[in-house]
Amino acid sequence: MAHVTAAERRPQLIKAAIDLMTREGVAAGSTRAIASELGVAQATVHYTFGTKEDLYRAVMEQLTHDLVTQVKASAPADAGFEETLTALVAALWRTVREQPASHQLLTELSMFALRTPSLREALEGHYREVTEVTALLVTEAAERTGHRLALPASTIARFFLAGFDGLTMQHLSLPDEEAGLPGLQALVSSVVALAGGKLDLVRIPSV
């Protein structure tokens, strides 16, 4: 049997982990079960990734990369700032509707990581990366269209992600396209207004 290098085995194990946990949940994602899913020895998982936490981190990175790649591909080349953001958000929402299992797995992994001290660093890194990627997309759209951002792109990105995560959870829990659309439209409108300095921020009294 031909030798398979760790570099070659890595994407295979990530896919096996995603397939298994999408089907059976994060709790089922032991290194033994993931190895069995791929048909390799359990030691192969540890040799390739070191720890289960490292594998989980790689799964989160892969799921995020796949979603971001799909969204970036939808960016229009000659549209205005609002139209560009709308197209990007529409593409991301399409992944929620068409690939709910991927978003559910990301949510489950995030909640699992909150309860697992050894995964907290991976979770923080994941959210930082998602925020940075979102901020970059906002920045690129603004620069291409000559739109001056009223707030830092990272602030706009965090606001958008907070709203989108909530809409995603609603859709996963109670799918209703008709009921969900106004919320999505309101989120995009608010993001555009925030980016353009047309959304007044109220003062929150300290507690």
Where do the protein language model's features map onto the residues?
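Hydrophobic alpha-helical connector segments
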Residues: 58, 72-102, 153-160
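Short coil/turn helix-boundary motifs
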Residues: 24, 78, 95-99, 116, ...
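Short, solvent-exposed amphipathic helices
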Residues: 122-129, 133
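Solvent-exposed, amphipathic alpha-helical segments
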Residues: 16-23, 70-73, 105, 109, ...
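Amphipathic alpha-helical segments used for helix-helix packing
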Residues: 98-121
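Helix-turn-helix
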Residues: 9-12, 16, 20-54, 58
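Hydrophobic/aromatic-rich alpha-helical bundle segments in the mid-to-C-terminal region
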Residues: 120-124, 141-207
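Short, basic, alpha-helical segments at the C-terminal edge of helix-turn-helix-like DNA-binding modules
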Residues: 61-66
